[in-house]
């Protein structure tokens, strides 16, 4: 199982990789890919795509998701993102809609958010793998322990990061973040079921750009 992760992340996470729970997690995941072939998403090389695309020190914004898309060919290791040849999912359509409304710009009709990640947006799912057609199928196998630690490491070692917490699941991570040194933005999930309960009209993206400017950070083009 080939896994790619950027060097600075290897250094930040090396102690985590040595822990018993993580070794058990790796063993479970390896077996899933071995026995279920092409039914586990994303492909092994993209499990840590969020970490491989963005060096640790370059993180400016964190957007938290729950687990990867469970349809074939969708997940690419970045939360809310899909491969460029895949139809844009409803939640991401609403994200683009809110960006266009709040920033008065036209988004690119392409669901691959690598362009955001390369500018400093850490698109982190709490659970990094999933079985086809079974959302949350890899819940409680160790991923949440790992990604909670990741959030704590970001909070402790970086300053003035914007955390966008959408929906109750993401809001539950607030206790892991030092609110005295970071900006936390909370609202409903962008899913069609809840986007009208706060997400659409939240101005999270305009607030994010303003905060980055106030702290002398290069802003992000969210097109």
From Swiss-Prot:
Q: Which Pfam families match?
A: UDG (PF03167)
Presence of keyword Cytoplasm? yes
Q: Name one GO molecular function term.
A: uracil DNA N-glycosylase activity
UniProt cross-references to Gene3D superfamilies, sorted A to Z: Uracil-DNA glycosylase-like domain (3.40.470.10)
Q: Which UniProt keywords apply?
A: Cytoplasm, DNA damage, DNA repair, Hydrolase
Q: Which reaction does it catalyse?
A: Hydrolyzes single-stranded DNA or mismatched double-stranded DNA and polynucleotides, releasing free uracil
Keyword check for Cytoplasm: yes
What are its E.C. numbers?
A: 3.2.2.27
| Catalytic residues (UniProt) | 67 (proton acceptor)
State the protein's purpose: Excises uracil residues from the DNA which can arise as a result of misincorporation of dUMP residues by DNA polymerase or due to deamination of cytosine.
Q: What is this protein called?
A: Uracil-DNA glycosylase
Species this chain originates from? Borrelia duttonii (strain Ly)
